């Protein structure tokens, strides 16, 4: 299948005003939307047909041109182009702004890109943009320098004149005062009058002095400010700025608002700035260097791309197509509209008002205010609520801006691009279908008819049951009888996909061959329930139909349920008989020596079955039976004198003979009693030894026999079955005494409350265990509850203990254990107080489940995101590196046995180097597949450790290689090229996360049940590379430890071997120290009990150790919960966490200091530099949490659709990033085939052509149909039936015009 629409890169950049105008089909000038009388869009408004295209297909607005024949004509009356109405989904308009505005993403984002570029604090930038301060945009340094002496002289002259004027005015007042006083003296005035005259004169003089001094000060201020004025200075004092402009306006320019920013950007010299910053980075220290690094990133982004910084200030605003911001009429004649229309309307209104004010020549203050309002309107259109209070609609709801359309789960990325609705799908309740084969599902007839409708219609026409598609459609809609036969034929061998939400791993969607069933419920095979985590208490499932031949082939070959018997997480079987089937098979293989027919001899199996039917032989009675086709096994060796092909006389039960008949003919004889464990091993063994077809057939046999004998066994549960013969009171009495003694000691004050609690808990735990053991022993072997639990069919001993023995200790709402046990069992009944204590745990269990399910789902999402581009890209990267893995360890008797974790560490890998025996012989060559057989041989030969290939050491530049990944756990074969191993890893780690979380709930909150609280949060802490709480220190160097214990504190002192300064580690008093005083410790030793910080491990021991540490820690959590996950899945994620390097010194490479770069790019740049004899860069490994690593990916599409959408897009657009489209998400977003599986080029370039034979056999019997009756269709035929006539039978000889 070829893909012609392939393109290699997707670039994002800053749109300039020219770009916006070029995209636009016209300017939106009016804020109107539609005419409420005619319901037609207003001209030049937000829905204008002239700009955005016609609202009806092939019809202009005024109705002059209608029909497709006028295609492409532009109507001269209304100006609308005659075309399809769907162009209203992609035609944009624009608003021509009367004043420039800044793009809020670049000014208000964190960090402020505009602020970094112009070296302005965001606060200052805000002042300029929102008209609170002036910004100097240019200074004519030359002219100022030239005229400075003259200006200085002029200033001096002016100040002198002012001072002289002041002095002369004061002198005049003083002279007048003298005259007045002389006059008063002569008139013989009183002293009071003289004082009054003097005071008045003093006041006048003070006023003159104050006024003159203020003017002088202002002049001095203006002069000083002007003398030192430089570009980018801010002036918040309007009066001062105006005075300076009036006096020295010809030497500088300044302005407010986005205009000022725009002018600065137009004259900004990026080259010079970059040089200056690089110099600062080389010479600077601390804060200055850090800021310079951050600024250099922004400056460099514009230097290395075609982006112009002027794109951060807009002269025109794009108007998105009207179909993406629709307006719909509601029932009551009212209209519902998208919030964007309101936001656009505010922008247009303010813009038009500003234009009018400018035309009128309004005062500057009014114009500036309108410009500020326009800036705010555009801000809220782009990102409402980013600055100040958000614009709200009715009911104080913030309006959804363009940014909000992209963000979050309901945003464009996650809602529409990554999660689309699917055609050809249905949904219904599921019921069990025990009669189905493993690869089948039951599809309700009506649903199948709707799903396969087009296929059925085509086939009806092919078979001449209908003359054309229209009549075929009518037949289908009326459920004519022939339709069902055609449907039956069409669905043969056409697989359908079944999916159950939540789809936690890939087994949540599987393909089945549909079988038509009556009713309306889907029927599901019992063995696939565990893969889907489905039960039949009302669960629903969705059906999807693969349409193209390629899709059908993939569904059949890769997704068919009989091909998905193994779990991708650990390679263990997932389709294992459960519940009823286990009980049935367990009943079949039980041995009861004292039953009828024990010790009898039967020559053949048939004879034994006849005796069983006649009641002479019990199913479980041991007898000697002659078995045909016997295959000896370790447990049941061949009888003496027996040779292959003969009937073997075996001491067994009829049940076991019947059980062995279910297995493949050449399978060794099984003599064990069937339990959940033995059946699991059996299925694993079958999957390993036999082709999938045989395994699937055997599983179906086991299922059928299990249900049959389960019914036959008559296992039921009644309250009378809860009869355990043991003396509970006697056991409890002893422990009651112990508890009382502890309580008395506490009452006397001999022990503290903590000790009392822990001792009581200890006592009651022992009591509970003893009661449980006694109860278990007291249950009769054939007791149905005992059989259910011991066979693994349902329940566990913990539940039985609570029903028949003792409920035990429970936890309180805080999660602490209450030291008073619930002594009753459910069989005896709880007292009121006991019931009350028990409710806490049960409620907490339910609440926890809900919370943790959400957390676990979020963890899976982050894991998928970080690893989605890890795909097997090549067969072999050629590396010789690998990991050393322990495969054997001595047991208690000193014998060498396989290591308990060998299944999850060494199994399914590839050897990195030869394994040699003690005598030097090569036991296994490098490149060999490590399977169960090889591990067994190596352990037998005494090998304890092997070196295997690992994803962690893979050298593929993109993704990983098949050899380093090893076997695919789900198929048991080497991973294919194109396998999306990253996503499989994420699912394998995330899916049990949810299961663990959901398990708290079944135990009803019993204290001994391991709550996952250590589980999930610990996993998140590790994958997010967070520093744990109460972090345990590790030794940074090798040396000797001394413990210094003073009254106030405890310190560990480490004296390094190399004689350097000793290092002190303060520790808490209650901490458990893991090293002894005076002990010599190697580097990286953990000194105190607790959690180690992975970042410290990386710093001290390097990346390899950090990788191992993370893998081991994650595995510890899962193993403590009894969940098996293969190491390779964790390794895939950990590799992604350590992919990046921070550049410290850039050397002579094109890397920037402080830049986070991919390891492959770093190595390539250094190799190139060394090859040319230049200085290579130096860097340090960076451990990133999965969220941070996802956001740091090369793909901006993937990062934007993950989290922090606006921040990612802002940064990507500024850097003009190109998305290489290597991952899965980016390709889903742009609608290309994903580059995994058959979507890889090596497969898509393959062309598939059916052979002639295949074409002929497409439908086995073209006319294999009975004749159907259509009563009363054509009475003139003289009969009541009408037959479809094959086209070949028509006489084509005559001319139809005759």
Swiss-Prot record:
Its cofactor is Mg(2+); Zn(2+). InterPro entries: DNA-dir_RpoC_beta_prime (IPR045867), DNA-dir_RpoC_beta_prime_bact (IPR012754), RNA_pol_asu (IPR000722), RNA_pol_N (IPR006592), RNA_pol_Rpb1_1 (IPR007080), RNA_pol_Rpb1_3 (IPR007066), RNA_pol_Rpb1_3_sf (IPR042102), RNA_pol_Rpb1_4 (IPR007083). One of its GO terms (cellular component) is DNA-directed RNA polymerase complex. One of its GO terms (biological process) is DNA-templated transcription. Its EC number is 2.7.7.6. Binds 1 Mg(2+) ion per subunit. Binds 2 Zn(2+) ions per subunit. Mg(2+) binds at residues 535, 537, 539. Gene3D superfamilies: 1.10.132.30, 1.10.150.390, 1.10.1790.20, 1.10.40.90, 2.40.40.20, 2.40.50.100, RNA polymerase II, clamp domain, RNA polymerase Rpb1, domain 3. The RNAP catalytic core consists of 2 alpha, 1 beta, 1 beta' and 1 omega subunit. When a sigma factor is associated with the core the holoenzyme is formed, which can initiate transcription. This is DNA-directed RNA polymerase subunit beta'. It comes from Micrococcus luteus (strain ATCC 4698 / DSM 20030 / JCM 1464 / CCM 169 / CCUG 5858 / IAM 1056 / NBRC 3333 / NCIMB 9278 / NCTC 2665 / VKM Ac-2230) (Micrococcus lysodeikticus). The gene is rpoC.
